[in-house]
Regions:
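C-terminal helix/juxtamembrane-tail motif
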Residues: 518-534
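Cytochrome P450 heme-thiolate monooxygenase catalytic core
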Residues: 150-158, 191-346, 363
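Conserved cytochrome P450 K-helix/beta-meander segment immediately N-terminal to the heme-binding cysteine loop
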Residues: 413, 431-458
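Short, small-residue alpha-helix embedded
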Residues: 342-355, 490
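Cytochrome P450 heme-binding "Cys pocket" and the immediately downstream C-terminal segment
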Residues: 355-360, 463, 480-518
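Conserved cytochrome P450 K-helix E-x-x-R motif and the immediately C-terminal K′/meander segment
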Residues: 105-112, 288, 292, 377-419
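Hydrophobic, well-ordered secondary-structure elements that form the walls
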Residues: 364, 396, 426, 449, ...
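N-terminal membrane-proximal hinge/A-helix region immediately C-terminal to the signal-anchor transmembrane segment
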Residues: 2-175, 197-202, 206, 224, ...
Length: 534
């Protein structure tokens, strides 16, 4: 027994306390299942014992080992860890399992809001993790000259990898430069404009067909963004707007991303579960569907430029065909999730606030009086600089950012200084977007929807550098301008054609209370009426 106890202590201090182990999670899990029976059989054979006698001996030894191991881990995390001085929920200091256990409703962003309200700007949300609601941290963690790197979270889907999830900065920058930058450059965006406008007009037409009857705006904004994504990314529409019903892939996406919302705080749990056939079925179906979209696109001949063409024709990142295939599959999923979920969420929240504050619609219409809404060729340049339109969109993004809980980074080995705080090296840090959007340090009246704060009342934005709904620096969202193009176009066309209001019995509560943080946002229902303008 003393030897088993010593081995448990040695395992922690000599191995588990050092480096990253999330990629070995499945191997460790399998070992924990296979080792006890193997040791039992070996003990029975070598010492000539019955299975029952051997089982008792192994149980005592393994029990002693595990008690020693976990006692050492817990004592270290409580009293000796480099983050021991930072406040936070007690059980969060011990294990990320506790954090996962709080997320049955997939509302991580709201938990973070409560924790920051209780504990302050720096909250320990895991054994080696800090959530930081400090505007001074943003440039140092996400800015172009940051020394922080991507955290272990980005390994969550390996071997599937995308530009977004790649932790190797050199590979990330090469992929962005040779493929993604071209697919989202100024010329490419101009080429996409007619299709963005075309789908916006189809959305207007389909909403008009309701003749003022209630409709689920969350669904229709999803139909629009998914159809645009399909066309611009893979050269084909999914015809959701045309058919007025959801594509099965949206349900797959929500189920697959739902696992992110629940388990992504503990990457090692996610990696174990996604390797269990029954549990991971929906996730694997979605990943397979994403990969198939890219494979089908590779076989197509398209006349109009699309994003996939730049990805397919870019120089390979490896001599291994499997690695290159995983890149395309990962980038395919990135396009589908990033290109549909985020745009749909922003549009839905924009129209929630317009229904709640109808005076904003009148302001938008006045601003749009000098814009020919039917001149599709000049529309984007006309909308781009409209202050109130952009103010409405910015307010929706501030209060309901596309990635509510923020993006994780790892501090450099030497640590990171933020004001009077010296953060230890090689810990996970992040700035929660949802929390920052409601920060009184950054905004006057942070809970109020005031579009003018972005142009005529700049004093209401105390820290403009805290507004990063599309992240910042080298890892900022490459689809930002396309997303804004889509949101501006739909907003302008709909408020020009319709009066917007909550449907009878609707007040927006369901959207606000039931939307889920699944890394991006899975929308709750929002029933609106769009009545033709008189």
């Amino acid at each position: 027994m003393p030897a088993a106890a010593f081995l448990g202590l040695l395992s922690h201090l000599g191995y588990f306390i050092h480096g990253e182990h999330h990629m070995k999670a499945m191997a460790l899990f399998q070992a924990s299942l296979l080792l006890p029976p193997a040791l039992t059989l070996a003990t029975a054979y070598l010492i000539d014992l019955t299975i029952l006698e051997a089982t008792k001996i192994v149980a005592v030894l393994l029990g002693t080992y595990l008690i020693s191991l976990f006692t050492s881990i817990l004592l270290y995390r409580l009293f000796f860890h480099r983050l021991r001085g930072y406040p936070g929920p007690f059980f969060a200091r011990l294990s990320k399992i506790w954090h996962v256990s709080k997320l049955a409703k997939k509302d991580n962003h709201k938990h973070l809001q409560r924790w920051h309200t209780k504990y302050g700007k720096y909250v320990r949300t895991g054994p080696a993790e800090l959530s930081i609601a400090d505007p001074d941290a943003i440039e140092l963690i996400y800015g172009p000259r940051t020394k922080c790197t991507k955290a272990p979270w980005y390994d969550i889907s390996l071997p599937l990898v995308s530009m977004h999830q790649n932790r190797n900065k050199r590979e990330h920058d090469r992929r962005r430069r040779t493929a993604w930058d071209k697919g989202f450059g100024a010329k490419a965006l101009r080429d996409y404009e007619p299709r963005v406008v075309g789908y916006a007009e189809l959305l207007v037409e389909q909403i008009g067909a309701f003749s003022g009857k209630p409709l689920n705006a969350s669904r229709w904004m999803n139909y629009y963004s998914f159809d645009v994504m399909g066309d611009l990314a893979f050269g084909k529409s999914f015809d959701m707007l045309k058919n007025g019903k959801s594509h099965f892939a949206i349900d797959l996406l929500n189920k697959a991303q739902g696992a992110f919302g629940l388990f992504s705080p503990a990457v090692w749990i996610f990696r174990i579960l996604t390797r269990m056939p029954i549990i991971s079925a929906d996730y694997k179906k979605f990943v397979s569907w994403c990969e198939n979209q890219m494979l089908e696109r590779q076989k197509m001949k398209v006349e109009k430029p699309d994003i996939a063409s730049w990805l397919i024709n870019s120089p390979p990142l490896s001599d291994d065909p499997f690695v290159n295939r995983m890149w395309l599959a990962g980038d395919s999923r990135l396009i589908i999730v990033g290109g549909s979920d985020t745009t749909a969420a922003t549009l839905t929240f924009v129209f929630h606030y317009l229904a709640k504050y109808p005076a904003e619609i009148l302001k938008l219409r006045k601003e749009l009086e000098n814009v020919n809404i039917n001149d599709n060729e000049a529309l984007q340049s006309a909308l781009r600089d409209l202050p109130h339109l952009n103010g409405v969109i910015n307010e929706a993004l501030r209060l309901n950012p596309p990635v509510p809980s923020g993006l994780q980074r790892m501090t450099p080995a030497e640590g990171l200084d933020i004001g009077n705080h010296h953060l230890p090296g090689l810990i996970t840090v992040f700035v929660p977007s949802y929390v920052m959007g409601r920060s009184e340090e950054c905004y006057e009246q942070p809970y109020e929807f005031i579009p003018e704060r972005w142009y005529s009342k700049p004093e209401m934005v105390k820290r403009k550098d805290a507004f990063i709904p599309f992240s910042a620096g080298a890892y900022s969202c490459i689809g930002k301008q396309l997303a804004l193009q889509e949101v501006r176009t739909v907003t302008a066309k709909l408020v020009t054609k319709f009066d917007v209001s909550f449907a009878p019995g609707e007040d927006g509560t369901t959207l606000m209370e039931e939307s889920k943080d699944i890394f991006t946002t899975e929308l709750g229902d929002l029933f609106l009426t769009f009545t033709p303008r008189k």
